[in-house]
């Protein structure tokens, strides 16, 4: 398994040969592309004492949730550790949470926490419907896109629409090398580790 990858933009393509790869733009001109090294770890997929991986991933939720919380919450000082946030909080008056499937249900739950802990107005949208409505984009709204894999097609399409309108976009994903993470202006990884089953536990966390 390789840990090197090159991302193609829309219209670009490549020809894979025995010992090298050639990249071209949509006009057919040869171009140079950067090769990136992914932060992948060689993990052993072991069920341990569990009968199957689903039981294992469900039982591991408390540990996974703890890892995610510890990444962003300083429990000793009762503070939030989110670094390099690109906007001032005074520039944000509302939040729109966008997701599909179980990620959408996670957004519904997150709405209650936002309203409980902040004074922000919060809306939740199903990604598949978001881009078909007549959206009134607002510069003071933070659009948060939730996707475990970071590759959910409808969620990415909603993100792309927001980017076209130069909105504030944030990704909540498990895979930091994913399309949604790469094209969002800010990323909050949830640090769930490798998911074999893609059950709803990763999105819910």
Where do the model's predicted regions map?
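Short, structured coil segments at secondary-structure junctions
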Residues: 118, 139, 182-184
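Short helix-loop-beta junction
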Residues: 111-123
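Short acidic loop-to-helix transition motifs that present clustered carboxylates
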Residues: 124-133, 151-153, 176-177
């Amino acid at each position: 398994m390789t840990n090197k990858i090159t991302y193609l933009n829309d219209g670009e393509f490549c020809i894979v040969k025995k010992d090298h790869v050639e990249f071209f733009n949509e006009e057919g001109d040869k171009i140079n592309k950067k090769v990136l090294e992914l932060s992948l770890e060689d993990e052993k997929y072991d069920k341990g004492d569990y009968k199957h991986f689903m039981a294992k991933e469900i039982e591991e939720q408390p540990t996974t949730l703890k890892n995610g919380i510890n990444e962003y919450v300083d429990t000793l000082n009762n503070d939030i550790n989110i670094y390099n946030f690109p906007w001032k909080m005074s520039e944000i008056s509302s939040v729109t949470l966008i997701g599909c499937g179980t990620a959408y249900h996670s957004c519904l739950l997150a709405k209650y926490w936002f309203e409980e802990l902040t004074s922000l107005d919060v809306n939740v949208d199903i990604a598949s419907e978001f881009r078909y409505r007549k959206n009134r984009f607002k510069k003071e709204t933070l659009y948060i896109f939730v996707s475990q894999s970071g590759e959910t097609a409808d969620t990415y399409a909603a993100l792309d629409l927001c980017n076209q309108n130069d909105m504030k976009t944030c990704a909540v994903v498990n895979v930091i090398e994913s399309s949604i993470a790469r094209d969002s202006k800010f990323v909050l990884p949830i640090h769930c580790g490798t998911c074999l089953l893609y059950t709803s536990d990763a999105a819910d966390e």
